[in-house]
């Protein structure tokens, strides 16, 4: 299997796939390898664990690291998992199965997704084959899963570690499942892509159409109730909170969903309808209903949303400061402008004067 870090293993032998191994009852400590000087024997715990029947390819797809074995995020995830297994022994089997028994982030993430999304007719082994085979062949997805987990770690104070994001945060997991479904959609495997969309919606409560186009470094905070329509486009470094709807209007085909610019911040329960553009670095306050274009680096709020100010920050999605208080406007917003970037006048009700 093509992995960014670690040695390739052969999981295709019939003996390894005949049955799933029983989980041993003894809790192993990551300190064991320090005492003996040998590498920690993960295979003694999980020699095979619902890995599927992956067929390695002759030309592995690797990220363009100077040293292809160097993957700092995956290295951090493994170190975090070792410490967490020692701090909470009851989770040691779960951590070894989900992270420490795998060779790379792609394989571990495929395992987690497969086991979260499986059902009696979509088996974990089948799903892991699907996820892994897509991830290890696509450089863009390999980059995205790392930039996304970095976004969660940097922007969500509730995200304690990289490992907690890939194991527990449904916004991150739903986003990565979408990325695989999107690739399948572009390959013409639309029925499978829609089946994955349906399972993600059932399990995580997040509905992202596989034809939507979403950039890298995305934070899908909480994720509950997020709906992203078929022709929606989302740029890079965007932060989206729970309950956001990027919906269409009417029943005509073609572009009928919003286009969200780079670095935008969409607050909780925002609804944006139709083929309208949210400019780069724009902020949409929680609970807003947006029915027309929003200028870049502006802030809108209300139902329907109205322009209430501008922001100096390049990417407000990175700071997550979306409370429209007087202190916020005095310190972050540009308090008084006669015109908005397209040259239109700003009405008096849309101005925030400094005192």
From Swiss-Prot:
On assembly, the entry states: Homomultimer.
Q: Which Gene3D superfamilies match?
A: Hexapeptide repeat proteins (2.160.10.10), serine acetyltransferase, domain 1 (1.10.3130.10)
Top-rank EC class of the record's enzyme: transferase
Provide the free-text tissue specificity comment from this protein's UniProt record: Localized in vascular tissues, particularly in phloem.
Q: Kindly list the places in or outside the cell where this protein is found, as annotated in its UniProt entry.
A: Cytoplasm
Q: Which GO terms describe its biological process?
A: cysteine biosynthetic process from serine; sulfate assimilation
Superkingdom of this protein's organism: Eukaryota
Gene Ontology molecular function: serine O-acetyltransferase activity
How its function is modulated: the record gives:
Feedback inhibitions by L-Ser and acetyl-CoA.
> What EC number(s) are associated with this protein in UniProt?
2.3.1.30
Q: What is its main location?
A: cytoplasm
> What keywords would UniProt list here?
Acyltransferase, Amino-acid biosynthesis, Cytoplasm, Transferase
The recorded induction information for this protein reads:
By cadmium (Cd). Induced in roots and shoots under sulfur-deficient conditions.
Q: Known Pfam families for this protein?
A: Hexapep (PF00132), SATase_N (PF06426)
Is Zinc-finger one of the keywords? no
Say which family it is in. Answer: Belongs to the transferase hexapeptide repeat family.
Q: What is this protein called?
A: Serine acetyltransferase 4
* UniProt key word Cytoplasm: yes
Q: What pathway is this protein said to act in by its record?
A: Amino-acid biosynthesis; L-cysteine biosynthesis; L-cysteine from L-serine: step 1/2
Cellular compartments per GO CC: cytosol
Q: Which organism is it from?
A: Arabidopsis thaliana (Mouse-ear cress)
Per its record, the protein catalyses: L-serine + acetyl-CoA = O-acetyl-L-serine + CoA
């Amino acid at each position: 299997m093509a992995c960014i870090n670690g040695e390739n293993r052969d999981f295709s032998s019939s003996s390894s796939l005949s049955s799933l191994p029983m989980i041993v009852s003894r809790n192993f400590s990551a300190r064991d390898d320090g005492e003996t000087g040998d590498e920690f024997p993960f295979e003694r715990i999980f020699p095979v664990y619902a890995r599927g029947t992956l067929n390695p390819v002759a030309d592995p797809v690797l990220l363009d690291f100077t040293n292809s074995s160097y993957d700092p995020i995956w290295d951090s995830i493994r170190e975090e998992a070792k410490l967490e297994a020692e701090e909470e022994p009851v989770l040691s089997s779960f951590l070894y199965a989900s992270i420490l028994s795998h060779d790379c982030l792609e394989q571990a993430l495929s395992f987690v997704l497969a086991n979260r999304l499986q059902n009696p007719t979509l088996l974990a082994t089948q799903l892991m084959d699907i996820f892994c085979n897509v991830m290890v062949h696509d450089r863009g997805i390999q980059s995205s899963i790392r930039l996304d987990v970095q976004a969660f770690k940097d922007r969500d104070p509730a995200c304690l570690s990289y490992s907690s994001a890939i194991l527990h945060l449904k916004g991150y997991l739903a986003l990565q499942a979408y990325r695989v479904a999107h690739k399948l959609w572009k390959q013409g495997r639309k029925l499978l892509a829609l089946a994955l969309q349906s399972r993600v919606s059932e399990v995580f409560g997040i509905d992202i159409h596989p034809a939507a186009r979403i950039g890298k470094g995305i934070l899908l905070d909480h994720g509950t109730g997020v709906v992203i329509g078929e022709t929606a486009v989302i740029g890079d470094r965007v932060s989206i909170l729970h309950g956001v709807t990027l919906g269409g209007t009417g029943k005509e085909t073609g572009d009928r969903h919003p286009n969200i610019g780079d670095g935008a911040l969409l607050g909780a329960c925002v609804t944006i309808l139709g083929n309208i553009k949210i400019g780069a670095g724009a902020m949409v306050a929680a609970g807003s209903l947006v029915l027309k274009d929003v200028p870049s680096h502006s802030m809108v709020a209300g139902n329907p949303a109205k322009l209430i100010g501008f922001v100096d920050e390049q990417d407000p999605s990175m700071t997550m400061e979306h409370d429209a208080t007087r202190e916020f406007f005095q310190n972050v917003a540009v308090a008084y402008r006669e015109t908005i970037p397209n040259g239109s006048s700003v009405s008096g009700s849309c101005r925030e004067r400094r005192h």
